[in-house]
Amino acid sequence: MFTENLLFYKEESLIMAFIDTIKERAKADKKTIVLPESMDKRTYEAAEKILKEGIANLVIIGTPEEIEKYGKGYDISGATIVDPFNDPNKQKYIDKFVELRSKKGVTPEMAKEQMEKDYMYYACLMCKCGDADGAVSGACTTGSFGACRIKRISKAIPHKKSPDRQGA
């Protein structure tokens, strides 16, 4: 029993050390991450922790009503809030969406409607246009749901090799 507990403790310590290493690397090269699921309290819980620890710059996509309703009680004052209905960059994202999906018959009206209905598209387009480095979802949707949107929008994003993995 003692040996099992000791092994568990060592595994847990290694995991925590690994997580701490990831956090330190993230802080050293702070990226802008979009959180498109503003209708889940877990988004705000995570955002508050990330902002408090200085791990990343955050963008939360949501209407003022969604932010007020679901984000109440969380300190997200360091995050940028993007209202997908009133964002000054919206037309740029619509144009990019149409450019990428015009062969599939996507019109500006369809792009606008899709972006207002599904914030993951908005997040992907922010990344595609260089306004964010990445997006995290999965609180309200499955991984395959998010991956489908990423594939539709991000297929033309060039792969960046990290400096320590030039041969990868």
Language-model segment annotations:
Residues 1-15:
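Short, Lys/Arg-enriched N-terminal segments with co-localized hydrophobic residues
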Residues 15-168:
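Anion-binding alpha/beta catalytic cores of soluble intermediary-metabolism enzymes, centered on
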